[in-house]
Design a protein with these regions (language model features):
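Conserved C-terminal structural/oligomerization subdomain of aldehyde/semialdehyde dehydrogenase
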Residues: 1-113
Length: 113
């Protein structure tokens, strides 16, 4: 489902929804697109399409999302951590980083002298 002419005042632009949904929001330049994308409480995934790899890297770095896809979407591998920023999750699934949810690190120093 594609929603066109979406503005940031609309509920569909501000809440995390799941399913095959695309909300199209107009922007003037790359910096505005990043501001719009980051101006929400969620940050599970983001996608960037660009012919300019330098721009794609800059935008991917600036986006506050746990996963950023460049010129693709929904690529995954069990060895790569998956999870979101902000209210889109706590911790990471997949990979060794997922173990952090189930373990607590402790340091103990003992002087045996």
């Amino acid at each position: 489902t594609v929603f066109d002419n979406v503005t940031m005042q609309m509920k569909i632009a501000r809440e995390e929804i799941f399913g095959p949904v695309l909300s199209a929001i107009t922007f003037k330049d790359v910096d505005e697109a990043v501001r719009i994308a980051n101006d929400v409480s969620y940050g599970l995934t983001a996608a960037v399409w660009s012919r300019d790899i330098t721009t794609a890297h800059r935008v991917a770095k600036a986006l506050r999302a746990g996963t950023v896809y460049v010129n693709c979407y929904d690529a995954c591998d069990i060895t790569v951590p998956f999870g979101g920023f902000k209210q889109s999750g706590n911790g990471r699934d997949k990979s060794l980083h997922a173990m952090d949810k189930y373990t607590e690190l402790k340091t103990t120093w003992i002087d045996l002298s």
